UniProtKB/Swiss-Prot annotation:
Protein name (record): Flagellar L-ring protein
Subcellular location: Cell outer membrane; Bacterial flagellum basal body
One term under GO cellular component: cell outer membrane
Lipid attachment site numbers (N-palmitoyl cysteine): C19
Name of the coding gene: flgH
S-diacylglycerol cysteine: lipidated positions: C19
Organism: Pseudomonas putida (strain GB-1)
Length: 231
């Protein structure tokens, strides 16, 4: 019996451990800075006034549009969601069965034990009802800024950016990661773009240390709010 309880306890601990979010780790290669590609060798000077590779556009600004360029993304995210759900199911059923003949003949309904004649009539009456209500609300706000690098420039001019920021504090570390697609026209002259203009954005805000651990529920609390709780 004790061995069986130990097996159940170990299985429950493993299931609850799987509910814990993995701790973020630094130096993720996906968010590593992307360096500019090695430039091609410069063409030999042939003595002409206009040399290929030395041109300058008088009307273009210095927006980031090449691989390895730096862009600052201003974070201004605010989301809120609420959901209400209700269900009610009710079912009533009733059946009355009356038999006067059985296989074409009238059966004998005399009660051999006394107390009146037997009856072939039967009846059924049933009622079932189920009612449930649920409500959930959630809100998130994230403000700040993070500087990332251009990882890729697509043929249509869309820029893929990604990067991360780690802040080392006394009791742990704070992490901000972002990846997404930016349109060159949305980049301001100071190489900034709001996060609301980043398409297919993947924004992560997490941390490690005592502050991050304090915001996590304990293993027993996770059991009570998990699908394993039968009530």
């Amino acid at each position: 019996m004790n061995r069986l309880l130990s097996v159940f306890a170990l299985g429950g601990a493993v299931l609850l451990a799987g509910c814990v979010a993995p701790t973020p780790k630094p130096n993720d290669p996906y968010y590593a800075p992307v360096l500019p590609r090695t430039p091609l060798p410069a063409a030999a000077n042939n003595g002409s006034i206009y040399q290929a590779g030395f041109e300058q556009n008088l009307y273009s600004d210095r927006k980031a549009f090449r691989v390895g360029d730096i862009i600052t993304i201003t974070l201004n995210e605010k989301t809120s969601a609420s959901k209400n759900a209700g269900s009610q199911i009710q079912k009533n059923s009733k059946a009355d069965i009356g038999l006067t003949s059985l296989f074409g003949s009238t059966p004998n309904t005399n009660n051999p034990f006394g107390g009146g004649d037997l009856s072939l009539e039967a009846g059924y009456n049933g009622e079932r009802a189920t009612k449930g209500d649920s409500k959930a609300t959630q809100g998130n706000t994230l403000t700040g800024s993070i500087t990332v690098t251009v990882a890729e420039v697509l043929p249509n001019g869309i820029i893929a950016v990604r990067g991360e920021k780690w802040l080392t504090l006394n009791t742990g570390e704070e992490l901000v990661r972002i990846a997404g697609m930016v349109r060159a026209d949305d980049i301001a002259t100071d190489n900034t773009v709001p996060s609301t203009r980043v398409a297919d954005a993947r924004i992560t805000y997490s941390g490690t240390g005592s502050f991050a651990d304090a915001s996590q529920p304990g293993w027993l609390d996770r059991f009570f709010i998990s699908p394993l709780w039968p009530f």
